[in-house]
Amino acid sequence: LVGSEMFIRDRLRQTYKHTPIIIGGIEASLRRLAHYDYWSNKMKRSILLDSGADLISYGMGEHSIVEIADALNSGLAVSDITFIDGTVYKTRKREDIYDAIELPHYEEVLADKAAYARSFYTQYCNTDPFVAKRLFETYDGKLFVVQNPPAKPLTQSEMDQVYALPY
């Protein structure tokens, strides 16, 4: 993260202590798992860990952001939002990760280009929202970043509703 992003994150946490921070958009989507950063010329961890955010909404977020809002509005803690397609979450509980493909550990990806290639290939093969599996990668043997399958695309009717909004 750059200084301004860290400043904003810190001010949000300071001002709104109990408000979940959910990130999305192109940067979060492309950096949701371990990735090569061209600016620094090195491998980086998931932006979920480095940003201090609670959750990532990746890809087209029209469905997932509404589901996240509904879950939070119903009283669910952000740490319990682990089931929404199009999201990435972090956990320390390996036993709670089910029906998922384990990617090479972050430390392995750092040390071995072939491990990164395997990870990237697995991610690439799981981009179709109709057949994709849940993926996860391990950090330091005790922290897990879990990517749920991509959100389903909008129907024509849903697309019309979204683009009829006054923005």
Q: Model features per residue range: what roles?
A:
Residues 27-34, 66, 70-75, 82:
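Catalytic cores of eukaryotic secretory-pathway lumenal/extracellular enzymes that build
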